[in-house]
Amino acid sequence: MNYRMLGKTGLHVSEIGLGAEWLERHNYEECKAIIDECYASGINILDCWMSEPNVRTNIGKAIAEHRSEWYIQGHIGSTWDGGQYVRTRDMAKVKPAFEDLLERLGTDYIDLGMIHFVDSEKDYEEIVNGPFIE
């Protein structure tokens, strides 16, 4: 596996990462097998979008043994509400969703944070100049 410095972060990440959203279609055993194969192949970065809660639990259990060797990219700005993905900038919803991500992943940190679904310059301005960044 080849690795590159990720911008100015100091993180050396694999050129290939695991986009975990599609793991929603798989049970724990399949998630574990996929994540183990990625780990064995040298993949060390996992993008965990705020998707269906159970898949985040499965991912957390699957990476637990090697958590410190994975770079987790988590997303904020979306939540899971009533079985449906919901885009939101409401911190009263965003913060508990992020805390749930940490809990389900079995960790107290993520390595990289992404603001989910910034679709226009107006979205960007509202995020940068509003309470979302604070």
Mark where each language-model region is:
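Short, surface-exposed alpha-helical recognition segments that flank or form part
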Residues: 26, 47-50, 85, 89, ...
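Structural motif corresponding to the early beta-alpha repeats
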Residues: 51, 65-92, 116-119
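N-terminal binding-site loop/beta-alpha segment at the start of enzyme catalytic domains
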Residues: 1-74
